[in-house]
Amino acid sequence: MPESLDSTHREHRARAQQFVARMRAQALDARGHITAAGAAELTSAARELGLHGMTQPRASGGSEAGALALTVVRETLAAANLPGARYAFGPGPGVLAGAEGELRRDYLEPMLRGVKRAAFAFTEPRNALQHTHARAEGDAFVVNGEKAYVTGGAEADFLNVLVELDGGARAMLVVDRDTAGVNLVEHFRSTEGGQHVRIQFDNVRVPTSHLLGKPGQGIPRAMLQIGHTRLLLAAEATGLMLWVDAYVADHLLAAHPTGTPLGAREGVRLRYADMRIDIFTSRSTLYRAARIADSGVNAMNEVVIAKVFCTEALGRVVDMAIQLVGGRALDAGHPLEQLYRRVRSLRIAEGASDLLRLNLAKGRLDLNKGNL
């Protein structure tokens, strides 16, 4: 639980709080974003505080922090609700974890150093008739198909693409984005500000040496990365709930034209109590899931529970916060209005809530896995 952290994890939290102080000191541009100079300063601060390498493997100079340590830091950063948290961590290995030889030299290491950018091409468009396919042809694979919701794909130097090989095995291929036949056919933006592209692969020749692992390992590699991201989203959700709680408490305790603070009203207190219950339960769920993940067992089901519960609780908490603050919370640019748009996507990212519910039930009823 958050209050029973050992000294090492309390130190992680203290360093994250120091990084938050650095974020507060940054000047913002006209759009409310961190400037280029500010980004460089925050990246330097993250290295100084030992945060930058937490997401990176030891073999590459990182500290390769565990799930609980990352949860503590991510929750602390999110609780500040400030631009700049993205600069706390260095790029993680993602599906390239464990890559050797050419893939390590030309893709993994440059990505970890920030020299190259990667994007994850996993999802087919809804109207796709088949999976993106890679046909073996001599010393190359010939890739045809389409991927949607490739976040950051327009800026990526290379793509990690889930493909189906002859015979049906799924695999991950590393594809340079400037390869002939890789076509960005649509750019779009989601409500929280994420930038995505739809990419078509038209007879794209990819060296066989760009196969990550072995045929059949594509889905397990992808799901390992997705699992890490789900826990990240749960930690972000709980941190944002802490920020909302503090904001609403200040509002309810403030002077009111009636002469009595809103927080003195019984109906308001009932709704605020519901928010607190959601936040307490979410944090308990999150921290238990992180500890299970650190224990070395397969924590896929527990992480699913944390992701679904925490992101849905966040939606309820933000919605009630707007109700308690009133109409001005819907004014464009109000922090709750911005948060309302931002958090809705969390219930869909890395697996929509009901899809994850089905997987959770399958884990127990079909595979007899998972803890309560």
PLM features: what roles do these ranges have?
Residues P2-L5, Q17, L68, V72, ...:
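Glycine-rich phosphate/cofactor-binding loops in nucleotide/flavin-utilizing enzymes
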Residues E3-T8, V182-F280, L346, N371-L372:
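Glycine-rich beta->alpha junctions and the first turn(s) of the following alpha-helix
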Residues R24-I34, A249, L253-P261, R276-F309, ...:
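C-terminal helix-coil-helix/basic helical segment that borders enzyme active sites and/or dimer interfaces
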Residues R47-G114, G152-F158, A293, R341-R344:
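Internal helix-loop-helix
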Residues G114-T123:
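A short, Trp-centered hydrophobic/proline-enriched beta-strand micro-motif
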Residues A134-A136:
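A structural signal for short hydrophobic beta-strand segments in well-ordered beta-sheet cores
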Residues A140, E146-N183:
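A short core secondary-structure module
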Residues A148-G153, H228, S345-A352:
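Glycine-rich phosphate/pyrophosphate-binding beta-alpha loops
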